């Protein structure tokens, strides 16, 4: 196991649980999709600050559950699957955030909401958005004079857990807007289905991929880390979306220079001339042209260990740790290479690091692309490539 990898995973699990403290042991575990909730509100009026003795954390505890009154402010329930006794408390919480000007159109927020049901502390994602069309149940006399605005809330897991998926939830809201603008029949039921599926569609894909591939997950991790193209065959659309989502989240896109990533993708494509092919025609997916290394194998085991707890939020945290460790190793290698340009002992340290880190094959390709225009570094990398090739030949 990589140094501190297991400790990191254990720590993340404890953090995710402690962020939901106050509930029972069962509540601190992942809530199944059936207990995730949503609320859709229509919003009309000014977002001028109306300070009403808000608590520091915006908690609705000890406040009236009714929407703040006033001709310039209206927050009306359009649809929800929350229990009726809980929804007014959530509405009060959202109304406070709106009145303080703390919510901006199209940018989701994540908070922890403590409702009056004993021990019910839950993560809440909420987002304000404008839409061209009004839902039938939200049409009023003043609708034509005001832009149609809505606030959507997704509740489930913990604040820390939902924060990991905030960007995906922002994209999910864009999908909701597209659905609301459709002319299709049965629009209301379609939107209701879309809202109620948020947990399954946004939070659970990584978990489903881990459970599907098991030990073969190492091939998927290696493909994501090395920017190797992946082709999925004989698969249903849901599984294909899950795999593509996993690859997108697992890649280092956004964490390394965009030009480096583009060059690396081109280099990997030219070098291999083949994509990794995943055949899903049988119950156990089969891989062709797949690669792996010790680094990916160790992290695959971390995912399988996490599967025992059944927490999809933990899978996402492990995936984030996987990427951070890869970036850390890449930065360490760059530092060693800079030192090795003037120091033979540093060159040896560089070689030993590559040999022991578990992902030397991929890291060397990344830094090779980044240092393409630097002659001194290119010489060091050429020597390291020769050392690694000799070490590989001796291992057979």
Swiss-Prot record:
Biased composition (Polar residues): 58-67
GO terms (BP aspect): intracellular protein transport; vesicle tethering to Golgi
Residues modified to Phosphoserine: 8, 18
Chief location: Golgi
Pfam families linked: Njmu-R1 (PF15053)
GO terms for cellular component: cytoplasmic vesicle; cytosol; Golgi apparatus; trans-Golgi network
Intrachain disulfide bonds: none
Tissue specificity of this protein: Highly expressed in testis and also expressed in fetal testis.
Composition bias, Acidic residues: 9-24
Subcellular location: Golgi apparatus, trans-Golgi network; Cytoplasmic vesicle
InterPro entries: Njmu-R1
Region (Disordered): 1-78
UniProt KW keywords: Cytoplasmic vesicle, Golgi apparatus, Phosphoprotein
Subunit structure: Component of the complex WDR11 composed of C17orf75, FAM91A1 and WDR11; FAM91A1 and WDR11 are required for proper location of the complex. Interacts with TBC1D23; this interaction may be indirect and recruits TBC1D23 to AP-1-derived vesicles.
Its biological purpose: As component of the WDR11 complex acts together with TBC1D23 to facilitate the golgin-mediated capture of vesicles generated using AP-1. May have a role in spermatogenesis.
Name of this chain's protein: Protein Njmu-R1
